[in-house]
Structures are given as structure tokens and as C-alpha cells.
Swiss-Prot record:
Quaternary structure (record): Self-assembles into homopentamers. The capsid has an icosahedral symmetry and consists of 72 capsomers, with each capsomer being a pentamer of L1. Interacts with the minor capsid protein L2; this interaction is necessary for viral genome encapsidation. Interacts with protein E2; this interaction enhances E2-dependent replication and transcription activation.
Assigned keywords, A-Z: Capsid protein, Disulfide bond, Host nucleus, Host-virus interaction, Late protein, T=7 icosahedral capsid protein, Viral attachment to host cell, Viral penetration into host cytoplasm, Virion, Virus endocytosis by host, Virus entry into host cell
Name this polypeptide is given: Major capsid protein L1
Major subcellular location class: virion
Biased composition (Low complexity): 517-528
UniProt gene name: L1
Gene Ontology molecular function terms on file: structural molecule activity
HAMAP family assigned to the protein according to its UniProt record, in alphabetical order: PPV_L1
Function per UniProt: Forms an icosahedral capsid with a T=7 symmetry and a 50 nm diameter. The capsid is composed of 72 pentamers linked to each other by disulfide bonds and associated with L2 proteins. Binds to heparan sulfate proteoglycans on cell surface of basal layer keratinocytes to provide initial virion attachment. This binding mediates a conformational change in the virus capsid that facilitates efficient infection. The virion enters the host cell via endocytosis. During virus trafficking, L1 protein dissociates from the viral DNA and the genomic DNA is released to the host nucleus.
Sequence similarity: Belongs to the papillomaviridae L1 protein family.
InterPro entries recorded: Capsid_L1_Papillomavir, Capsid_L1_sf_Papillomavir, dsDNA_vir_gr_I_capsid
Length: 539
């Protein structure tokens, strides 16, 4: 006997006393996933090392500058009365960047000892810097900087009653010894610095007088004469400190820059920093606070008010500032006057000098002695000392000497290499007299037959645009080495060090020469002398 059960659109039959198990099958239904779908990242242009397309030769050259000297006032530039912007004495401080722009000769126009080194039809020559030595003259010394009206309120290092209300000028004449810095950055483009500057508020908010300005981190090229970080921070003091007395004279209206090592290390082509040498040290010598109205009021839940009897009813100035100090200076910690060899750069550019130039950024505060000069206002010099009859002057002097070892390299101009160099820097190919054809155009161009006829408009020849120097408006100390290359490495101190380091020997040019030893084959075939034979006489 069977039982019928209606289910949905069908009929299911069950048999009595029979073991039957119905199975219900449901068709699968596809639904889109609710989870986020991540696409693969887009492909990026691959940056290759210069070692992949630059072939190095066995030809090396030495190039060096003459003695480089500079003299000036360590705190400010001296402008004579009525001279306008003309400066009589420039500002020369040990706490300035010295950025040397080294100009090299064009190797493709260079007189080479062997003309078969490269094929000018398919190859180009470039320089690679493999060695460098920065010589520094003058003795080690410490130079002070300060301000005759320095904003120093209380000595917060020792116990002192807090000065709550300041109603008069309490500035003092203070001098400090700055942070100690030794720095050297080598690259084929200028180094990049960073500093904090005054930013802008989002509209419609407006900055009211007395409000704290917003800060913005800016990146700029480090130029010759820019101030380094002296221990007061990398910032624009001219726009962020209106009192002009929070820091010493030489930086109160200047911008102190700090090298942006993060950005230069992340440079995809590695042109701004082949390598760098850095040594910094400082400690806090004195602890002071600043005079003025506190812009940020101390929350009342952070302290318990005192009484007026002990002058602690209201808190005093809580803007604290130390005086930096660079501590002891020794010759054991010197980074200069020693050679450095470049085997592998930190970036993709392994020392190739694009555009035949180098940028050397140097800081050395271990030779910051300021010379004191005094001149009598009377002639002859008074026999009795009177300070009003003598004028005091301060000068700072610096002495440099740059030495380099360059290696001659070749680049085979294949289509792939030229396309890569064009994407990296198209001006390199332009300097090699390679041009990129303009894109095709569909517009008609008018061409007159009689160009000199007065019946038609004047056909002026368009002058080709002049090549613009991208660093024309920037300040650098230019060092021209175009006529100072020499292949006689043994005639220069750095060249002799390079020969020893590279394991190379030079041929003797004078003196007797040893005879060449006989070859093995000649010695084996040569006749040997006969042995002596003794003949005894018969008795």
C-alpha cells in the first residue's frame, strides 16, 4: 500500500513497510561575495642600477682644486653706509653649509690616450667618481655665538623662585657654543634639506594676532651659505620668532636646514646622495625659560595653586629652552683629511657624474674659531689703554682642498638604454646631441615662396631656445676642474693612495732596468759547460 504526499510541485510516494528514505536535492544559487575584492597592484617602471648599462674602463684620472679660502664676519654681513645691497664683508660662519659645484670636462671631447676605447657612433663616455678626499686647513677650535639681547628669564636648572609676571625687559647678553657637526654629502645633484616654516590655515579660519602659527615641513635645496642646525631646531626663525631674540644673532633672521636623509635615500635614481659622512654631538649646558605671556595656558588640573606670600600664586613661564653645547673637540673624531673610496653607492647611481658635474655638501664646525681683530682709532697707537680708542672686529676664515679620482666609463646607446635615460633625464641625451622627434601633427603649416618679398608679412626666424641652467638662481661655490685632469696618479697624494689601495704599480720612468730573465725553453736547450777532468801523472 502506498501513500502519496504532495510537496511543492511534485508528488512523493512512500511504500508501506518498506525502508525508503527520501532525499531532497536543492539547486545551488550563485551570489556575489560581500567581501572586498583587491586587484593586483599596477606595474611600475623598473629602475635599474647604472652598473647594468655603464661599462667601466681601466683608465683613471686625478683632479684637484687649488687652495680654497673664504673670509667674513661670522654673525652677519657687513653693509657699508649708502652702499645699498652691496656688501663690504660677507657672512662666513662655520655653521654654514659649503656646497661645492664641481665642473668636469666633457669626456666625449677629451683628449684620450687611445682612440679605440669607444665608438662615437654607438657609445658615449661618462665619468665615475671612485675616490674623494676633502682637505681642511686651520686648527681645531671653538667659536662662540650669542645675542646681546637674549630672551633668558630664569635659571631653571637650580632651585629658583618662579617669576610669575614680567613687565620689563629682562634680556641678557648671552653666548653659547653650538652643536658639533661634521657632514659630507656627495652626489651629482644638490642635496635636499628640510625645515619647519609658517603654514596656512584652512579657510575660512584666519590667524589672529598672537595666535600660534601652523607649521609646515618644507623641502628645499641646500645652497652654499645656508645655516645648519645649531641645536635650536631646523626652522625658519625669521617668520616663526617675531622677537628676534630667542636665538643667537647669526640665525635669528635665517633658516636653519637639516639634510633630508629620508628623501635622498628614497631617491629612485640615487643622484642626490651617492654616500654621506655624518657625525653630530651636543649636550645641554644651561637650562632656561622664556619671558613673555604664555600662549598655551597650563591646565589647572596639572598643579595646585600657591599663595601670594611665597610668590607662587600663579605659575611662571613654562617655555623651557636649553643652551646647546658641542662639547670637546679632538682630532681623533675627524672625518676630513682622509681618503674615501666609492665601491657601491647607497642608491642606483654608482657614482656616475651626469652632466659632468658633482655637488659636494660639507659642514665642519670643529674649526669654528673666530678671530678677534682690534684697530686703533688714533695714529700712533695710544700708550695708555682706553677702550673707547680701539675698534673690535670679528672674522672667521675657512680653508678647503678638494681631491678626486675619476674613472672613464662607456655607455652603449641601444634603443632600450636611450629610452631609459630619456625617461630618467631627457637633458642628458640633449647634451649628447640626441634629439627626440616631435609628435606628428595634422595641422597645415603655411610656407611662403618669396620670403624676402614686401608683399607678404615678415618671416622672422625663430631663435632656438637657449639652454637654461636649472641651478642658475641658486648659490653654490663653483670649482672648475675642466683643465686639472691628469693621468699621472703617482704625482698626487690621493693618486698614490689610490694606487696602493687598488693594488696597481706604476712603471719606473728613470733608472736602470733589469734584464729580462731567460725563458724556460731557452734555458733547457742551452748547452751546459763540460765538467773538469783531472789527469794524474804516472810515476
Amino acid at each position: 500500500m502506498a501513500h502519496n504526499i504532495i510537496y511543492g510541485h511534485g508528488i512523493i510516494i512512500f511504500l508501506k513497510n518498506v525502508n525508503v528514505f527520501p532525499i531532497f536535492l536543492q539547486m545551488a544559487l550563485w551570489r556575489p561575495s560581500d567581501s572586498t575584492v583587491y586587484l593586483p597592484p599596477p606595474s611600475v617602471a623598473r629602475v635599474v642600477s647604472t652598473d647594468d648599462y655603464v661599462s667601466r674602463t681601466s683608465i683613471f684620472y686625478h683632479a684637484g682644486s687649488s687652495r680654497l679660502l673664504t673670509v667674513g664676519n661670522p654673525y652677519f654681513r657687513v653693509v657699508p653706509n649708502g652702499a645699498g645691497n652691496k656688501q663690504a664683508v660677507p657672512k662666513v660662519s662655520a655653521y654654514q653649509y659649503r656646497v661645492f659645484r664641481v665642473a668636469l670636462p666633457d669626456p666625449n671631447k677629451f683628449g684620450l690616450p687611445d682612440s679605440t676605447i669607444y665608438n662615437p657612433e654607438t657609445q658615449r663616455l661618462v665619468w665615475a667618481c671612485v675616490g674623494m678626499e676633502i682637505g681642511r686647513g686651520q686648527p681645531l677650535g671653538i667659536g662662540l655665538s650669542g645675542h646681546p639681547f637674549y630672551n633668558k628669564l630664569d635659571d631653571t636648572e637650580s632651585a629658583h623662585a618662579a617669576t610669575a609676571v614680567i613687565t620689563q625687559d629682562v634680556r641678557d647678553n648671552v653666548s653659547v657654543d653650538y652643536k658639533q657637526t661634521q657632514l659630507c654629502i656627495l652626489g651629482c645633484v644638490p642635496a635636499i634639506g628640510e625645515h619647519w616654516a609658517k603654514g596656512t590655515l584652512c579657510k575660512p579660519a584666519q590667524l589672529q594676532p598672537g595666535d600660534c602659527p601652523p607649521l609646515e615641513l618644507k623641502n628645499t635645496i641646500i645652497e652654499d651659505g645656508d645655516m645648519v642646525d645649531t641645536g635650536y631646531g631646523a626652522m625658519d626663525f625669521s617668520t616663526l620668532q617675531d622677537t628676534k631674540c630667542e636665538v643667537p644673532l647669526d640665525i635669528c633672521q635665517s633658516i636653519c636646514k637639516y639634510p633630508d636623509y629620508l628623501q635622498m635615500s628614497a631617491d629612485p635614481y640615487g643622484d642626490s646622495m651617492f654616500f654621506c659622512l655624518r657625525r653630530e654631538q651636543l649636550f645641554a649646558r644651561h637650562f632656561w625659560n622664556r619671558a613673555g605671556v604664555m600662549g598655551d595656558t597650563v591646565p589647572t588640573d596639572l598643579y595646585i595653586k600657591g599663595t601670594s606670600a611665597n610668590m607662587r600664586e600663579t605659575p611662571g613661564s613654562c617655555v623651557y629652552s636649553p643652551s646647546p653645547s658641542g662639547s670637546i673637540i679632538t682630532s681623533d673624531s675627524q672625518l676630513f683629511n682622509k681618503p674615501y673610496w666609492l665601491h657601491k653607492a647607497q642608491g642606483h647611481n654608482n657614482g656616475i657624474c651626469w652632466h659632468n658635474q658633482l655637488f659636494v655638501t660639507v659642514v665642519d664646525t670643529t674649526r669654528s674659531t673666530n678671530l678677534t681683530l682690534c684697530a686703533s682709532t688714533q695714529n700712533p697707537v695710544p700708550s695708555t689703554y682706553d677702550p673707547t680708542k680701539f675698534k673690535q672686529y670679528s672674522r672667521h676664515v675657512e680653508e678647503y682642498d678638494l681631491q678626486f679620482i675619476f674613472q672613464l666609463c662607456t655607455i652603449t646607446l641601444t634603443a632600450e638604454v636611450m629610452s631609459y635615460i630619456h625617461s630618467m633625464n631627457s637633458s642628458i641625451l640633449e647634451n649628447w646631441n640626441f634629439g627626440v622627434p616631435p609628435p606628428p601633427t595634422t595641422s597645415l603649416v603655411d610656407t611662403y615662396r618669396f620670403v624676402q618679398s614686401v608683399a607678404v608679412t615678415c618671416q622672422k626666424d625663430t631663435t632656438p631656445p637657449e639652454k637654461q641652467d636649472p641651478y642658475d638662481k641658486l648659490k653654490f661655490w663653483t670649482v672648475d676642474l675642466k683643465e686639472k685632469f691628469s693621468s699621472d696618479l703617482d704625482q698626487y697624494p690621493l693618486g698614490r693612495k689610490f694606487l696602493v689601495q687598488a693594488g696597481l704599480r706604476r712603471r719606473p720612468t728613470i733608472g736602470p732596468r733589469k734584464r729580462p730573465a731567460a725563458s724556460t725553453s731557452t734555458a733547457s736547450t742551452a748547452s751546459r759547460p763540460a765538467k773538469r777532468v783531472r789527469i794524474r801523472s804516472k810515476k
